[in-house]
Amino acid sequence: AGRYAYSPDCVAPSAVKSPISPFVPLALDDEGINKQIDDFVSCAQLAKSAGYDGIEIMGSEGYFINQFLVEHTNKREDTWGGSYENRMRLPITIVEKIRSALGENFLLIFRLLLEELLL
């Protein structure tokens, strides 16, 4: 859940504390971001192997993916932050890798928040 996680080991795009958790998240490095992407793919593969026809990827409500999209929680100055194109890199990469791993017939729904009200 990114910075919303109630754990001293929480991670996020940047070290921006959530108002609902006492812990400041660790800003992920490239290796950590790629592990998170791989974990999304692994979870999608588990859903498919369990017989699901598809999954919904939660890119909204202030959770992990959404934290990369929003300037308030993404203070990065690398390929994962800054411009809107860079901030969209994480969700696009997750979707592309899931699609590549599971094929065109596995249903993917991506929930995207259109207005950021959660800080």
Go through each PLM region and give its residues:
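Flavin-dependent oxidoreductase catalytic cores
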Residues: 1-119
